[in-house]
A protein has these predicted regions:
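Conserved small-residue
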Residues: 1-3, 13-16, 30-127, 235-245, ...
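Short, small/polar-rich motifs associated with maturation and membrane association
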Residues: 29, 117-118, 272, 282
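Structural signal for terminal/edge beta-strands and the immediately following C-terminal loop/tail
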Residues: 274-295
Length: 295
């Protein structure tokens, strides 16, 4: 727009259309007087029906150093939101460079980043950043003076780009001073960094999100204390997952790449889920002890 008229050089407008459909199921059951349980299951899918670019776009910049021109998430009309778009990794070549699959079987491998939308490109959906199923499971138990509340949670079917591995796993000569990431998926022979399915991991998880155990003391009749309870609470007690990154939680909004420890302004993207950025930290485990006394 005319900066002289409006005071700025661009405007934002709604230029796309999405369609989200899904199902949610909530079930509760009282097993007996001492045990009640409930479970919530949800599943949904979002399709991009209209977009300002008819042929689509590839978004979510991998970032610096050296991979600013690498984008990872496909946004295309008629496709589901969240497809992580990448060449399919096969092996490390004799020179340390990655060898990719000839996905379309035409006898040549076209895996350059700027060729992602060509008719002969060898790119595919290496995963999707949106879970196909999410669950929450609550349990309340009591026996004698004891009570237990346990809440489990899980997400399944989603993938994450492990950007820690993408940057710090290949043994690149210019990064010899780095502490290389060394997961079970690492390939020591790989000495060149190029984004591919190698760095896309299934991130299914099941965790004990919250556990509270409490004991109510018997109080003698006539005591100046009318009640006393001792409790212990653990948040993020355990997580079961095969994901090697910091946190398998779905990353439904990409905050964008960052430089010098800071996010680059204006890069947050709701159309690019599935990126585990290097700024993310491990989830903490919190243990709390409590004593409640009533007079």
């Amino acid at each position: 727009v005319d900066i002289a008229t409006y005071g700025f050089d661009r405007r934002f407008e709604n230029s796309g259309k999405i369609n989200t459909q899904g199902i949610e199921l909530n079930l509760g059951y009282e097993v007996n007087d001492n045990y009640q349980t409930s479970i919530n299951l949800s599943s949904y899918q979002t399709i991009l029906e209209e977009y300002v670019l008819e042929n689509g776009d590839i978004r979510a910049n991998l970032g610096a150093p050296g991979q600013n021109s690498t984008n990872m998430v496909l946004v295309r009309p008629g496709e589901v939101i969240g497809q992580i778009w990448a060449p399919r990794f096969q092996s490390a070549g004799a020179d340390g460079s990655p060898v990719f699959a000839d996905i379309n079987g035409d006898g040549q491998v076209v895996a350059a980043q700027d060729k992602w939308n060509d008719a002969d490109a060898d790119f595919e959906a290496a995963g999707n950043g949106v879970p196909t199923l999410e669950m929450g499971w609550s349990n309340n138990l009591s026996f004698g003076n004891w009570s237990v509340n346990a809440f489990f949670r899980g997400a399944f079917g989603h993938s994450l780009v492990n950007t820690f591995r993408a940057f710090y796993e290949p043994r690149i000569a210019s990064q010899s001073s780095y502490n290389f990431v060394n997961t079970s998926l690492a390939i020591p022979e790989l000495t060149a960094a190029q984004f591919s399915s190698l760095y896309v991991e299934k991130a299914d998880f099941f965790k004990l999100d919250n556990l509270t155990v409490a004991y109510n003391f018997n109080i003698a009749e006539g005591s100046f204390i009318t009640g006393a309870q001792l409790s212990a609470n653990v948040q993020n007690a355990f997580v079961i997952t095969n994901y090697t990154g910091t946190d398998p939680e779905p990353a439904l909004v990409d905050p964008g790449s960052y430089s010098g420890g800071n996010f680059v302004p204006g890069q947050g993207d709701v159309l690019a889920p599935g990126i585990d950025r290097r700024i993310n930290y491990f989830s903490s485990r919190t243990v709390t002890l409590g004593l409640n006394i009533n007079f």
